[in-house]
Amino acid sequence: MSGGTPYIGSKISLISKAEIRYEGILYTIDTENSTVVLAKFALLGTEDRPTDRPIPPRDEVFEYIIFRGSDIKDLTVCEPPKPQCSLPQDPAIVQSSLGSSSTSFQSVSSYGPFSRMPTYSQFNQKSFRSTKFGRGRFRQLNKILRTFETTTSASLSQSSAVGSSFTSDARSLKTQLSQGRSSPHLDTLRKSPTMEQSVQTTPASHLPPPGPVGRRSPPPARPLPSVNQRTIESQEQKRVEAHRLSRPEADQLRNENKDANKRQAAPGAPPARRGRGGHRGGRGRFGIRRDGPMKFEKDFDFESANAQFTKEEIDREFHNKLKLKDDKPEKVEKPVNGEDKGDSGIDTQNSEGNADEEEALASNCYYDKTKSFFDNISCDDNRERRQTWAEERRINAETFGLPLRSNRGRGGYRGRGSGMGFRGARGRGGQRGGFGAPRGFRGGFRGTRGGREFADFEYRKDNKVAA
């Protein structure tokens, strides 16, 4: 076979440096990235070649695979490209698809993912002019692949994105062929190695210039019947009807849920099982305002709003809150033995001096140990502040109040404790059953001995309770 026969579209047997053989159709060769792409390939495994990791063959036929030129060990041309058959120019043909055995690889450079890949004509005129091949070794192509740049590698993300686009295009084309309708995306679907098999005819305004692949277009004088537009309109009408029917069905389900809740709340009905979170309800359209958005008659008057606030009064109130003076009424000195101390100059001088000192202390004192909260936890207190049970019980009662004693089940309240039990009952306070609120160790007893105060029990040295 002469060198003028194109290699693109030939069946290629490729062996990688891992001794794994792949067999598929040569789709294209990228000279910039030094990659080779095989379409419709099969994995034949390592076969009998010596390798550390033998791989068995697989029966699946994959869409495509990209090889780096530096990782290819050997190439063999198994079969030349098969001749292409074209359909007759019949205006009655709306859409057709060829079998999987017939593929076309001549318009390689027009594909989106491989826009930089050269066509066969570049290789045909330069390096393969004097090469003859049959089922023998493809030595010349192997030498060219080894002269490619080995520093660049194909990106895995790009290959995965290309593979997903091929499979999605194939699925969408199959659904369109089964429904018998066309789509404006059919021109883009043709630009993939697996979609080149299908031969479709559309109106002349959507067709690219005719090529040697075998696409035929009907004469422009005879327009095609508008079957596709009718099917699209009917589908849109069905969607609108389904949307209209969905709202009454949702209202009906909502009413049924309300009736079921009423039946459960009836006096003769058995009590419903109590859950943890209660009824969540459906995801209906609740809380929607039906009176429309709020409307205002006029703009907001900032001047009248600011006139209601007096800056001086606000500042005065703020400064009054910052002052921490003692508001005790002044003591009126009573006369002693019928004599008024105010008559003596010494007493008057001493009282004036004491008043000045008190005012100075009152203005500089911001913390009163006799009134402040939690003053007993100060670091200046060197005494041992280990609280007794009675002290902590009193503090809990003053802080949180007394709990209800008729609480049953796993009641009580969480927090610092329920005021019952040793050390404030940190955890699940109260009792876990029984007929009262026993006050025992760490949250109460689990038994049914209720109603007895903790003070009724005797303490022993080993912290055991005597009945």
Curated annotation (Swiss-Prot):
Instruction: Identify the domain of life.
Output: Eukaryota
Any GO BP: regulation of translation
What are the Polar residues biased-composition ranges? 172-182, 194-204
Give a yes or no for keyword Cytoplasm in this entry: yes
InterPro entries to which the protein is assigned, alphabetical? DFDF, FDF_dom, FFD_box, Lsm14-like_N, LSM_dom_sf, Sm, TFG_box
Residues forming the motif FFD box are 365-381
Give the compositionally biased regions (Basic residues). Answer: 273-287
Q: Where in the cell is it found?
A: Cytoplasm
Motif TFG box extends across: 384-404
* UniProt feature, compositional bias: Pro residues: 206-223
Keywords on record:
Cytoplasm, Ribonucleoprotein
Tissue distribution: Expressed exclusively in ovary.
The Gene Ontology CC terms held by the record are: cytoplasm; P-body; ribonucleoprotein complex
Bias type Basic and acidic residues, positions: 233-262, 325-344
- UniProt key word Secreted: no
Per UniProt, residues of the DFDF domain are: 288-324
Q: What does this protein do?
A: Does not appear to bind RNA.
**Oligomeric form and interacting partners:** Component of a ribonucleoprotein complex.
Family as reported in the entry's similarity comment: Belongs to the LSM14 family.
- The name this protein carries in UniProt is Protein LSM14 homolog
Name the species this protein comes from: Pleurodeles waltl
Taxonomy of origin reads: Eukaryota, Metazoa, Chordata, Craniata, Vertebrata
